[in-house]
Amino acid sequence: MSWFSGLLVPKVDERKTAWGERNGQKRPRHANRASGFCAPRYMSCLKNAEPPSPTPAAHTRCPWQDEAFIRRAGPGRGVELGLRSVALGFDDTEVTTPMGTAEVAPDTSPRSGPSCWHRLVQVFQSKQFRSAKLERLYQRYFFQMNQSSLTLLMAVLVLLMAVLLTFHAAPAQPQPAYVALLTCASVLFVVLMVVCNRHSFRQDSMWVVSYVVLGILAAVQVGGALAANPHSPSAGLWCPVFFVYITYTLLPIRMRAAVLSGLGLSTLHLILAWQLNSSDPFLWKQLGANVVLFLCTNAIGVCTHYPAEVSQRQAFQETRGYIQARLHLQHENRQQERLLLSVLPQHVAMEMKEDINTKKEDMMFHKIYIQKHDNVSILFADIEGFTSLASQCTAQELVMTLNELFARFDKLAAENHCLRIKILGDCYYCVSGLPEARADHAHCCVEMGVDMIEAISLVREVTGVNVNMRVGIHSGRVHCGVLGLRKWQFDVWSNDVTLANHMEAGGGRRIHITRATLQYLNGDYEVEPGRGGERNAYLKEQCIETFLILGASQKRKEEKAMLAKLQRTRANSMEGLMPRWVPDRAFSRTKDSKAFRQMGIDDSSKDNRGAQDALNPEDEVDEFLGRAIDARSIDQLRKDHVRRFLLTFQREDLEKKYSRKVDPRFGAYVACALLVFCFICFIQLLVFPYSTLILGIYAAIFLLLLVTVLICAVCSCGSFFPKALQRLSRNIVRSRVHSTAVGIFSVLLVFISAIANMFTCNHTPIRTCAARMLNLTPADVTACHLQQLNYSLGLDAPLCEGTAPTCSFPEYFVGNVLLSLLASSVFLHISSIGKLAMTFILGFTYLVLLLLGPPAAIFDNYDLLLGVHGLASSNETFDGLDCPAVGRVALKYMTPVILLVFALALYLHAQQVESTARLDFLWKLQATGEKEEMEELQAYNRRLLHNILPKDVAAHFLARERRNDELYYQSCECVAVMFASIANFSEFYVELEANNEGVECLRLLNEIIADFDEIISEERFRQLEKIKTIGSTYMAASGLNASTYDQVGRSHITALADYAMRLMEQMKHINEHSFNNFQMKIGLNMGPVVAGVIGARKPQYDIWGNTVNVSSRMDSTGVPDRIQVTTDLYQVLAAKGYQLECRGVVKVKGKGEMTTYFLNGGPSS
């Protein structure tokens, strides 16, 4: 079994957080449930407690049935790791699915009339984020793409001006005013193109340029209507249609401005047509058709602009959400890393995370994280008089006092280049020279000892208790690392560590060192003989020569003075910038500011100021996003990831991911195509004669499109339809290939409706009829001849032979075909190449029919009859031979150019939409990838942290930055505590070359502890919590929180007893397979304890109290291979049927005589 087998959990749901919780709403936690010491408290014996949530009894014990150990809710507490939604909605209150939550089921309830009208009005409103700052970011986000689009539009408009100039000047004498207008417009578009590409071009300038373009287009439209010869309500109708379309699609303006501009251009053309053709008998028919045509064009524009902008805003919002989650995770990871590296050295933590990441196969032995360091100094410090101090205060006050003292020691250790290893009760030990080797490691430990003695003097002064520090130092070799699988604590082992532990018996206020340490001091300190062997049997047995430090090194004094001077200078320079904080009270007997400085309380309070002044999370996200927008290059992104013409990703995996994107608005696209079809039908019925066949074709196409819309709507309407229909709907809507095919099919149906009526019209060339009547060749027939024969424009009756009606205004066929092509732009999910191919195929089909098919006669007849109409309007009569030429290019020759211009605009818009969508996808994918990397890193960190601290304790310290002297503790009413030690392991441990200087002995100890950890991980022992290991002693407890405490059944106590017996069995199994004879002593006790963490910056979870001390004594006074329990525990276990025997009265240090029992077995049943 691999060492991390107990850590890795199969990933069931990708949306799980690193805690193993699902992204979703959690059950609300109520702060008022926690009271007393059951809720975390942050107290200090040097100052008043932080005001907790109002509780009825803040200092009384809280029974566990009150759901203790619940964290107080507050900012930053209990934050899920999924994406946090923020108020980023639109001003029109459009509802979008919050990031990181499940998609909300569509609202299928019937809407009222006002509600439907409100939803419809929302479509025409400009979209805008509620936050002005976010809106500016959004505009910056798409600025480069809009700038590129606007530049291309200028080029298209310059080309369009050239086309209009050619159409006007080619057939007849051009009008100078209109030529000058087109020339000026072309020059202005070129100038605007240059302006758009300047580095100083900004968002405000873009809007100004857009409105200038609209003004120029309106002027060109007016000039074209006035210059038309002959005048006609349908003359040049394609031009305002084109202007309206590009207003919605290629101009970067808001929806409201686009709607107003599109309606304005449409109204302008209608007014001009009405004023210039007021005497035409067919004026109102054509004006009605023009109104429908413009309404359809504006509808297409809205159907294109609205989903494109909403998609862009949602993509931006999603990208921002991913960035927000990434920064949130990054912040949490920094806190995790800080907390993790405060407990484990960096090289150990990184190696553990690497092993979790690589997921190595099971090995015969668990991996051991041990390193050897040869030249280090080990310091052990013990508080002399601690028992007297403990007798004068409660357990909580004692823990708070130790916390503040050890927090000060941690600061001193950092200043003196020492690494704190562990805190064992009132014992503090640290090492200098690891993880980085130092030549002055002995000096560092001695200075650390001097500072510790100075610090304890303040405790002695303010408490009135005679406490001192016993400090012992030894230099030599250590093995450092962690053992086991759970609740890792960095530790050191070696014979030199054992020796250093015995060296602390040097006496109060003195530093006791060995000769090995003295040799590293280079004579910088005065010493005297220590005679350690007289006070400690181990030192006497090992013949260790010891010394006592008399005075500090002069060199070190000078260095410290210089450092203190620099710190004072820096503090003075910051004094005007930061308010000085002074605690409300210290120990009950003093408020001496010097004492505060000596204890380091001022400094520790400053440590948290950075957190207070931290940037607001929302502002941090916006600032990061702004920098990312400024740094990214659209052109470079396209070059690196997207093929130039096809706009497909260069990497196949990206293309596959993109192709799996589902467009939820596909049903709306088909509905827009149905709307365009209806408009085309209205135009055809208004302008052209129709037959029963045409009505049947229109009805069939209408039914096909309507059925398609309904099928697509089934996907969003829940389970009201048959399963087969739902499956068909999902297959269409959720498949890019199928939805593209259906989109092309819909456009094809609309195109058929636009050209179907052409085949029912009269196809007889009017020239042929007139030539027969006038005995002329068809080439010689002119408009004047037709005028003489009383032919006129607008007659529906057949002009020549045949019964088919005459289609007098084929310009509307062109307009309807343009509408059918524009309908393809509504389908935003179809690729630009697909739209280009579809446009060319449909356009080519139409041109073949126009130029080579029977309908060609319709367009030739129209050009002649338009000349007749012009002659009639001029009230002049001409001879057939002297007839003036028609002042315009023939419609069938204009049509290919018009189709080409529209195809170019359609392709540019499709390129813009697809390019934007792909770049948004790319950026969101990158943000998602970075977020996932952060989540993986967070998962690794949390797995490590949860093997160092309990989950709720780790969450407490990750919630916000903690001060060094800040305390986290809980009062627990009834906890069972176990100490299990291998009595003869010290005899087994030897340091020889054959066993790699003792590493192999530690490897076996690691296997033993790992087995114990695997057992405690079993479901039946879920109420147990491993506390720590102390050398070869294993410490565990049960009933430490609400989920594991059983007040009625006391199952947590019996679980610990079962675990103790299970360890005895496991040790026998280990002895059989390792050919050893290890003997275990286990001690059990129960009662109240205080559980908490000492050292907020270097947290170490532990439990304290008389219960813990007695449990330890049950182990130390026990008998090998037996489990010794106290009378309190005996009463609980005996009532449950456990087999126990009375040992008798045992003398226990600090407790006198106690009656104890041996646990022999479980219940008889």
Swiss-Prot record:
Top-level lineage group: Eukaryota
Cytoplasmic compartment residues: 1-149, 304-670, 911-1165
Chief subcellular location: membrane
PTM comment: Phosphorylation by RAF1 increases enzyme activity. Phosphorylation by PKA on Ser-659 inhibits the GNAS-mediated increase in catalytic activity. Phosphorylation by PKC on Ser-553, Ser-659 and Thr-916 inhibits catalytic activity.
Entry membrane topology: Multi-pass membrane protein
Subcellular localization: Cell membrane; Cell projection, Cilium; Cell projection, Stereocilium
GO cellular component: cilium; membrane; plasma membrane; stereocilium
Domain notes: The protein contains two modules with six transmembrane helices each; both are required for catalytic activity. Isolated N-terminal or C-terminal guanylate cyclase domains have no catalytic activity, but when they are brought together, enzyme activity is restored. The active site is at the interface of the two domains. Both contribute substrate-binding residues, but the catalytic metal ions are bound exclusively via the N-terminal guanylate cyclase domain.
Subunit structure: Part of a complex containing AKAP5, ADCY5, PDE4C and PKD2. Interacts with RAF1. Interacts (via cytoplasmic N-terminus) with GNAS, GNB1 and GNG2.
Protein's recorded name: Adenylate cyclase type 6
Native species: Mus musculus
